Every structure is written in C-alpha cells, then in structure tokens.
Amino acid sequence: MPRKRHTRLVSQPTPISIQEILYTTRAMRRLRTDPVPDAVIARILDSGLRAPSGGNTQDWRFMIVTDRDKIAAIAPLYQAGLAQLFEGHYKQANAATRAAMASGTADRRTAQLGRVLDSSEHLAAHFADVPLLVFGYLTSRENAGSIWPALWSMCLAARAEGVGSTVTTILEMFAAKEVDEILGVPDGSGFYRHACLPMGYPTGRWGVPDRKPVSKVVYHDTWGTPPAFAPSEPLWSLHG
C-alpha cells in the first residue's frame, strides 16, 4: 500500500552557513524510514535545477520515486548490482579491507574504506525502506557532464534541509533497462539515466568527512608543486 504523502506546508529549517553545507555534505547511506515531506522535496528539486548545464540546454529529466512498491521492486536490483561490484572490480580491495579490519591491523585509510563498505552494504540491505529516490536523465548517453552539477546541487540543498543523500550509479551500471521498466520510461524516450540519489533523514550525525588535504592534491602553476598557501587541515569545523 502506498505510504501517505505529506502535503502540508513544511516550514524551512533553521538556516545554516554555506560553509557548513559544503563541509558536511557527505555520503549518508544510513537513512531513517520517515517520509520526506513534499514541500521539502520541492525545495530540493527547485534549488537543484538552478545548476548550469552545457549551453544551458537543460536537456534533462528527473524522476522522483516515493512509491513503496516501486522502491521495493528496485531494491533487489540494487542489491544484485552491489554484489556484482564487490565480486568484480572491488573484490581484491574488499577482501583486503575485511581482513585488515578483522585482524585489527587496518590503518586510518583502510578503516575509512571499511566504514564505506559497511554503509554501502547497509544501504543495499535496507534499500526497500529508503523514503525517496531521485534519478537523473539526459538526452546524451556519453556526456554526463551536464547532469552532475544539478544532482550535486540537490545533495547540497538536501543537506540544508537536514536530509541525507548519496550518489550511486550501480543501478545504471547493472540494471538500466529493468529500472526504466519499473518507472514506466518508454523505449525510445531519448533519455538516458545517469545516477540515482537515495535520500532520507539520516540516522547518524553530520560531520566534516575525512579527506586528503589541499596540500596533497593541488598543484600551482607546475605539476607536483603545491601552492605555498595550501592548508594541510580543514579551514572550517563544526566547532568553530
């Protein structure tokens, strides 16, 4: 039975700074089952559509899915796709990470990867309970550059609303046709799906994710030369 949608006007959340949005928007794969109200979804979508596209063509379509039966039908496709990914491209890294975690020899980066693997498996196991999916389509199969700014803007807008999100292409890699059939996308529509954003209120807390510092990944004028001003630690934190 479809879950009843929230149609009442939902007040906007307490504003947070752009720095907090940028620094704390990270992959949130552990989501509560609470529905995301329609008014919140509308703000996320409307904000995301302000993003640029190549030539301002806006040759995109976005599909939002809240129907419980459709999400339940998509869930096993996502689970099978993740299993294929873990048994294929990520098989060696997955096995090595699991072994290091089990033996207590994991370093900081390995432990971080272990948490990513755990949260990815959690999302797959609970995919049928995700309250909101956002799919991004373009008229181009190869040139996805025009869809990513809008999708990421939606992730940022979701963060401003207290809604967690993550970007995944597993369904596009392993179940493109099957998902389109579930969603009623006609053959020959001329649109190609590029990514899925599972969204929902997170079970955990927001925080600044562990990332390599500017000084390690940015060069200035010459390859291999970092900027003299490059910080080695985040310039912003939740604690000021």
Predicted regions and their residues:
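C-terminal helix-cap and adjacent tail motif
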Residues: T7-T14, Y192-G240
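Generic N-terminal amphipathic, Lys/Arg-enriched alpha-helix
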Residues: S17-D34
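Short catalytic-loop micro-motif centered on adjacent basic/acidic residues
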Residues: R30-R32, R61, S165-T169
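Short amphipathic alpha-helical segments
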Residues: I41-D46
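Small-aliphatic-rich amphipathic alpha-helix that forms the alpha element of a beta-alpha
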Residues: G48-L49, L132-I182, L197
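Glycine-rich phosphate/pyrophosphate-binding beta-alpha loops
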Residues: A51-N56
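Glycine/small-residue-rich phosphate/adenosyl-binding loop
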Residues: Q58, I64-G145
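A glycine-rich helix N-cap at a beta->alpha junction
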Residues: A83-T97, L183-D210
